[in-house]
Amino acid sequence: MKRYATYAETRARFAWDIPARFNIARAICDRHEGTALITLDGHRVRETTYAALRAMACRLANTLLAHGVGPGDRVAILLPQMVETAAAHIAAYRIGAIALPMFPLFGPDAIAYRLTDSGARALITDPDGVAKLDGLDRPPLVLSVGPAPGALDFHGTIARASPDHTCADTAADDPAILMYTSGTTGQPKGVLQAHRIVLGMLPGVELPHDFLPAPGDRLWTPADWAWAGGLLDVLLPGLFHGVPVVAHRFRKFDPAEAAALMIRAGVRNAFLPPTALKMMRTAGISPVPLRSVGSGGERLGDALLDWGRGVFGVAINEFYGQTECNLTVGQCHSLFTPAPGSMGRAFPGFDVAVLDLDMRPVVEQAGEIAVRAPNPALMLRYWNNPAATARKLRPDAAGQVWCMTGDVGRMGEHGDIGFEGRDDDIISSAGYRIGPDEIEACILRHPSVAMVAVVGRPDAVRGEAVHAVIVPAPGVEPGAALAAAIQDYVKTSLSPHEYPRTVEFRDALPMTVTGKVRRRDLRLNL
């Protein structure tokens, strides 16, 4: 994107250029030479070139095709930040398949649901992931980066395939990525994104990173590549622009290790979720000079922003979006001064409004944040869920379709948008958007639980923390031991980032006359 003197001019002169035929793999891996990925191996900094990444991806693409995986099939990827993860994505895109990223810390229940709901034909994982498949219906093809029983060895298998592959001729609107996002009702929904998503993300990546790319830029985020923040906001746009991306796996985020990593790997541009920033501030890390820092997921607050400017030497640019239409609003302090307390303004190419109950745009009033369709960053649809798609993509009285975020905001007279809260039950914790239904379903499977409701409670570090209100089964004694057992059960069955950090026992839950739990009443009493 070209920089002009003002935000208004930059926005006015911007125009989308989306070709009819477009493939992510060709765009991010076939156009560049030099360093694509950087990993830290002990005390060594290792670089993977675009040529090496392309060869690995082509070998994997040919392997997938040889095993009957083809266009439109889902390829699940259950791996941490590593070279093989990027190659797996590129291979899926190359053959016209749909990449299905999954969080490496997912437990068997979460993995089983996503594999079954998507109908995945292949799974690329590691020994940790293979171990979680016991008792589950496996995809026909399982490749493991490292030896694991019942799985083909990733490197040994693809070594027998050709490093040459002709990329599929896909349309920009052909499906490419299936990411599951939390919702308030039912199981997580699969968000189906097209190949054009990479182009749609560029304005929201370039502005917060002060018009990336610039000479010497190098990107990193602790956000896993299974999430929109890691995959869509860092890995894919970084590779698209030829900017090296640092890959590193944290078993558990460590602020001192993160600061040391950024210095050792020469990071110049970082996406740091709010929780990571808060932990770094609490740890009192030494200064880490960066060219740009972006953050999103929850409000940062003046104290954290002031600290960040002092430690990183630049203003932190906040941004906002959802998996369904990511990076729509944000900041670029070198281009304009955001209104105090706001998330920023609509990025060039995005028409964002705050709508009242009649879906009419309002200014200086609270309403629902919405993004005008069509837009290249907008999802195609929810996977096999037309009813949810219809609720998300709704026409106003004039027939104009909007992507309804479910978030309440307020727009100022100059276009700055402030976030005021959510109008649903989504829990925003440490940068994750967590829906209560999946957690409640997991807890209800515990034999000691009769009823459960999950809500978010305020948390100084995470923004919100998962809180479970439980009615024990008859004859079960509530207490600390039961609470700990339920917490461990969710950690191992679902995911460590979704377990209830606090558990409360009650004799009954507040209910509506139609038998629904009144979560709002529970939140008000926290």
Question: Where are each of the predicted segments found?
Answer:
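Conserved pre-ATP/AMP-binding loop-to-beta segment of ANL
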Residues: 35, 149, 161-182, 187, ...
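Conserved AMP-binding/adenylate-forming core of the ANL superfamily
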Residues: 36-90, 107-112, 155-156
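Conserved AMP-binding A3 loop
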Residues: 46-50, 176-203
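Structural core segment of the AMP-binding/adenylate-forming
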Residues: 66, 90-156, 266, 474
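AMP-binding/adenylate-forming catalytic core of the ANL superfamily
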Residues: 106-109, 123-126, 270, 375, ...
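Conserved AMP-binding/adenylation subdomain of ANL enzymes
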Residues: 199-221, 226-268
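Gly/Ser/Thr-rich phosphate-binding loop
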Residues: 240, 267-272, 280-338, 351, ...
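Conserved ATP/PPi-binding loop(s) of AMP-dependent carboxylate-activating enzymes
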Residues: 346-349, 360-393, 434
